[in-house]
Each structure stands twice: as C-alpha cells, then as structure tokens.
C-alpha cells in the first residue's frame, strides 16, 4: 500500500523535482525523456494493463511547462478560426486557462465529470478514457450550452490516446449546438499519432513493462 501511494506521488510531482528524481530511482520506476514545447521532461511510465504501459504527462504543479505548452498550442490553429476553447476536466484545466490568458479570451468551457448544483438543466454524454476505469459522463450546464450554440469550438486535450474522451467532447459540443472547428492536444499517444483530424505538439509512444517502446 505504501509503495502504491509513493508511486502516485511520483506522478504528481514535477518531473524535475529532486525528490521526484530520488523516488523514481529508489523505486525503480522507468521514465521516458521528452522535449515538450521546448522543455526537457521525463515522463513516469505507468501500468494500464499487464501488456500496456503509458507515459504520464502531468502539467499540475509545473507552471513553466503549462505556459510553454499553451503558447505552442495556440500556434497550431489560426486565432480567427474558432470562437471558444473547450476541454474536459481535470488535467487540461491549467492548460486551457493559460491558453485563454495568453490569447486574451474572456470565456472558455470545461466539461465536468459530474453534475454540479450551479448547473441549470445540464446536458451530458458518456466518456471512456484509457486512464479512467469504467464509463464516466461529461456534463455541461445549459447556460454554457446556450453560449456554445452556433459557435465554432476548438477542442483541446492534454493527451489524445484512444480518442474516447475526444469523441465525448465532440458529442457534447454537438449536443449543445456548437460546431467543432478543430481538435488539438499536447501529445498524441500510440495510434493517435496517425490521425489526420487532430493537431498536436509531439508524439508519445506506449511502452512495455520494462520501459522499452512498444512496437
């Protein structure tokens, strides 16, 4: 149990924090070095199944990486090609906020993983992600849905993998009456790298249990 808690802590720690490096070395956790938005980072390699391991990309706590990724994401699409930014909670929240700040956007939208008391008449769709067990739902308040109706929406995610979360966000935008103007991500993982309907900053492979790249 202690070992499990420590491993979760490693993922949350900033990649280059001295304590994070110490814990990864002490607990023999494999990492994958990457250049992301011009910054060098090491992603902890985490188990999904016995045959599938992924590199954990976490912006939480890494202000430098968040600012750099937001800057580069904004370069992927023309500013006049969309009206609003849209993402789902939770890992992409720092990114979308920083993108809005840098671009001067006054409003952006976040799909929530549960209905909130402040949401009037929320709409929802189902979502299944590689990093989340089971099927979950994404919710959007009717007030936000009304603002989205008829508008061009740029969907952003931190990592696109199986595409389940991305599809759920597309469905939620469509249910609100919005128009998907583009789909962008920091990283495209595994087979998602071959998609021609997304733009991303860097490819991310998937891994074997020994930390080697899965072919």
Predicted ranges, named:
Residues 106-153:
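Short, glycine/charge-rich flexible loops or terminal/linker lids adjacent to PRPP-binding catalytic cores
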Residues 89-95:
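Gly/Ser/Thr-rich loops at beta-strand to alpha-helix junctions
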């Amino acid at each position: 149990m202690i070992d499990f808690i420590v491993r979760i802590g490693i993922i949350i720690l900033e990649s280059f924090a001295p304590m994070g490096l110490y814990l990864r070395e002490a607990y023999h956790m494999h990492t994958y070095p990457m250049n992301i938005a011009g910054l060098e980072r090491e992603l902890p390699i985490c188990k999904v199944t016995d045959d599938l391991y992924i590199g954990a990309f976490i912006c939480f706590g890494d202000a430098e990486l968040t600012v750099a990724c937001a800057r580069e994401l904004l370069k992927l699409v023309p500013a006049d090609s969309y009206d609003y930014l849209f993402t789902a909670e939770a890992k992409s929240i720092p990114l979308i906020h920083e993108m809005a700040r840098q671009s001067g956007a006054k409003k952006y939208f976040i799909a929530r993983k549960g209905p909130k008391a402040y949401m009037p008449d929320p709409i929802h769709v189902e979502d299944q992600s590689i990093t989340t067990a089971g099927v979950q739902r994404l919710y959007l308040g009717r007030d936000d849905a009304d603002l989205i109706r008829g508008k061009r929406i740029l969907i952003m995610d931190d990592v696109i993998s199986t595409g389940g979360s991305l599809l759920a966000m597309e469905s939620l935008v469509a249910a609100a009456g919005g128009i998907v103007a583009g789909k962008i991500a920091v990283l495209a993982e595994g087979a998602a790298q071959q998609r021609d309907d997304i733009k991303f900053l860097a490819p991310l492979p998937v891994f074997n249990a020994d930390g080697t790249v899965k072919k």
